[in-house]
UniProtKB/Swiss-Prot annotation:
The keyword RNA-binding is assigned to this record: yes
HAMAP family per record: 23SrRNA_methyltr_KL
Pfam families to which the protein is assigned, alphabetical: Methyltrans_SAM (PF10672), RlmL_1st (PF22020), THUMP (PF02926), UPF0020 (PF01170)
Name of protein: Ribosomal RNA large subunit methyltransferase K/L
Molecular function terms, GO-annotated: 23S rRNA (guanine(2445)-N(2))-methyltransferase activity; RNA binding; rRNA (guanine-N7-)-methyltransferase activity
GO CC annotation, single: cytoplasm
């Protein structure tokens, strides 16, 4: 009997213990990362051949305390390596762990290697060679604080490498992880198993091999024990022959195919088919291209299990399409798989909430570095009500759920808004406008339409609102938006908006570089919905830009703090004599230039200037008839000499603007500070007059948000 150790992924130790016991292991003891056990030769080989959960099977040779690299070297060079392999074989050292003295795994591996080759030299043998690619012998060293365990790796290559997977889709599951998911899924052999997003087919292939009694390592050609002197070839051949006969018997029973794999990508399905063929289970699995939104139960009145590892993102805010995917998936499960079991493995528990199902059991696990969860559900039998709705001779089946519609109040409000605002926008020839702006306090978000795209901007929840509850409401709202608008999931963008500090509104979020243009009162304006927090177009200033276009005829126009120059476009299309566009950001100034070119606006009379707007204004000696200034509420950018506060500094700004404003000129001044108070007395001292026009510049889609901006007409006193 030998003392052995089976390694596995964290979270699967107890499951592995059950498997090892079933395979004949004795005295199994669970520790983090694996199971200690004892076994005779026959059981040892059976575990190597049949374990679906083990990553490696290790034979410990040295267990000792080490406090320095000399201790490490001494422990290795003192081991009798010739009892395990001779000098003609190649070897490789895998070293894991550190302590105070051995602080790098590469150094640890080198010292183990030195000890082994020096041992052979001391015994009059040639130094065995190291082979990093295909070693005959693999030595596994593990250091935990001061305790060292050095083992012979009987597996060779890791046991998750079954040999059937030639190619994969994105983010494939390790075979050992897939087997664990299947074993925890509540699926029973002989019953249907459906994977609606099967990818390269690993879950189904692992399950099918269990059904077909195919040992996972049956076709492995090279083992870590091939050149080990303790290898018992006779016992090994016996165990392997038993496995071959079991697989043949199962094949001769002509098992009925009851595994189904669906995927939207036909190229990935071809890989899955090839993998299944290599694994010897292609006759058991049916593959079909299909979208989750149209998922149908492929069986006839049978009860089975749906198993799935859907895609998931590490950041929920970048994956609105996944919210839609899980929502639609949950709906199809309830519609098509009544009385079935469902097991879903995901790295984002919040996405599983979108299924709108209640798990009766869940497990934690790791998928590489990601913390994941597997949840098991049972789909309740739903009442099916057949309503004879005659519509083009079609009969509609209406399914009545015990659950109420997700975010029903929000969905109803959104429908109402769309009906009103879409009609108005079509009349105004607009295709970028707001559909919803925190109308209901519990759904604190904005929904904007940009042509055939939808942006959902979540306002940061107050500190007293439970984070999980806020996240669930967001998921519910996104599901409702997809249902109400019918938009394609890849055209919905989700952003989290918070109070901006300094120039953070200009910070880049992504680098997709996807631009398209929208129409606004005859102007065409480029927008980018993904790369920045803002899109390049402030929708609430739409009427202000229109007004500027109407006022600009024959005038010299200045756009200060110009952003992407959309106001300049309107002024130029309004036949301004000249335009000057000033902004500190080169990115946005280039954007402004592209906006002008998009509208065929060219010429020396249209100037674009990159500069600190306040510093440029101090030096400007040119006069203007019409000035639009929409400064930030606050800024402390390193590129500005001084900080800026619109409430504190607006009179100083007006004093500078007065200097360059012609006698009959007009300043259109706007900002987004809530509760802004114009210093009327300060303006009078400057001999300027101000009229607030905020209400006149609020378009229909922003009429509920009276404080989104304030706007003023400022002129010289007559």
């Amino acid at each position: 009997m030998k003392q052995l150790f089976a390694t596995t992924s964290r979270g699967f130790e107890e499951l592995l213990k059950v498997e090892l016991t079933d395979l004949g292991a004795q005295e199994c003891r669970v520790v983090q990362g694996g199971v200690h056990f004892i076994a005779n030769d026959e059981t040892q080989y059976r575990i190597l051949l049949w374990s679906r959960l083990s990553s490696r099977i290790l034979l410990p040779l040295i267990t000792t305390k080490i406090y320095s690299d000399l201790d490490l070297y001494s422990a290795i060079v003192g081991q009798n390596w010739l009892t395990h392999f001779d000098e003609r074989v190649t070897f490789l050292v895998d070293f894991n762990g550190t302590n105070r003295e051995i602080r790098h795994t590469q150094f640890g591996a080198m010292r183990v290697k030195d000890g082994i080759v020096d041992y052979f030299e001391r015994h009059g043998k040639t130094r065995p060679n190291v082979d990093k690619e295909y070693p005959d012998i693999r030595i596994h060293a593990y250091l935990n604080q001061d305790e060292l365990v050095v083992s012979l790796d009987l597996s060779g290559e890791a046991l998750h490498l079954r040999g059937y997977r030639e190619d994969t889709g994105k983010a494939p599951l390790r075979e050992t992880l897939a087997a664990a998911i299947v074993l925890r899924s509540s699926w029973e052999k002989g019953t249907p198993l459906v994977d609606p997003m099967c990818g390269s087919g690993t879950l189904l292939i692992e399950a099918a091999q269990m059904e077909a009694q195919i040992a996972p390592q049956l076709h492995r050609l090279h083992w870590g024990f091939d050149f080990w002197k303790g290898h018992n070839q006779v016992v090994w051949e016996k165990v392997k022959q038993e496995a071959v006969e079991l697989a043949e018997q199962a094949f001769n029973r002509k098992l009925t195919p009851h595994f189904w794999g669906f995927d939207l990508d036909h190229r990935v399905l071809k890989k899955a088919q090839k993998n299944a063929q290599n694994a010897g289970v292609s006759h058991l699995i049916k593959w079909q291209q299909g979208d989750v939104a149209g998922l149908k139960n492929p069986t006839e009145q049978e009860i089975g299990t749906v198993i799935c590892n859907p895609p998931y993102g590490e950041r929920l805010g970048t994956t609105p399409a996944l919210i839609a995917l899980y929502s639609v998936f949950g709906r199809q499960l309830k519609t098509e798989f009544a009385d079935w079991n469902v097991s879903i493995f995901s790295g984002e528990p919040a996405l599983l909430d979108c299924l709108r199902l209640r798990a009766y059991r869940q497990f934690k696990a790791k998928n590489g570095p990601l913390d994941c969860v597997q949840k098991n559900y049972h789909i309740a039998v739903r009442k099916q009500v057949e309503s004879a709705v005659e519509n083009s001779q079609e009969k509609t089946l209406t399914f009545v759920s015990e659950n109420t519609q997700v975010a029903q109040d929000f969905a109803n409000r959104l429908r109402k808004n769309i009906k009103k605002i879409d009609k108005w926008a079509n009349q105004q020839k607009l295709d970028a406008y707001r559909l919803y702006d925190a109308d209901l306090p519990e759904y604190n978000l904005a929904v904007d339409r940009y042509a055939d795209h939808i942006i959902v901007q979540e306002y940061a929840a107050p500190k007293n609102v439970d984070e999980n509850k806020a996240r669930q409401r967001l998921l519910d709202a996104v599901s409702a938006i997809l249902l109400v608008t019918g938009i394609e999931t890849n055209k919905l963008i989700l952003k989290v908006r918070q109070k901006q500090k300094g120039t953070s509104q200009y910070e880049k979020l992504a680098n997709k570089g996807e631009y398209f243009y929208v129409h606004e009162y005859g102007a065409k304006l480029w927008v980018n919905l993904t790369d920045y927090l803002d899109t390049g177009l402030f929708l609430d200033h739409r009427l202000t830009r229109k007004m500027l276009g109407e006022m600009a005829v024959g005038k010299d126009f200045l756009n200060l703090f110009a952003y992407t120059g959309s106001a300049t476009v309107h002024a130029a299309l309004g036949l301004a004599k000249s335009t000057t566009t000033v902004d500190m950001s080169n990115t946005y100034l280039n954007w402004a230039e592209q906006n002008l070119l998009l509208n065929d606006i060219e010429g020396k009379q249209h100037k674009l200037i990159q500069a600190d707007c306040l510093q440029w204004l101090n030096k400007c000696d040119r006069q203007f008839d019409l000035i639009f200034v929409d400064p930030p509420t606050f800024s402390n950018s390193k590129r500005m000499e001084d900080s800026w506060d619109v409430q504190r500094d607006h009179i100083k700004l007006m004093a500078n603007l007065k200097r360059i404003l012609r006698t009959n000129g007009t300043i259109v001044f706007s900002n987004n500070k809530r509760g802004f108070k114009m210093d009327i007395d300060g303006l009078q001292e400057l001999e300027l007059s101000a009229v607030e026009i905020s209400a006149k510049t609020l378009p229909l889609d922003f009429e509920r948000n009276k404080q989104i901006h304030n706007c003023w007409i400022i002129r010289h006193q007559s």
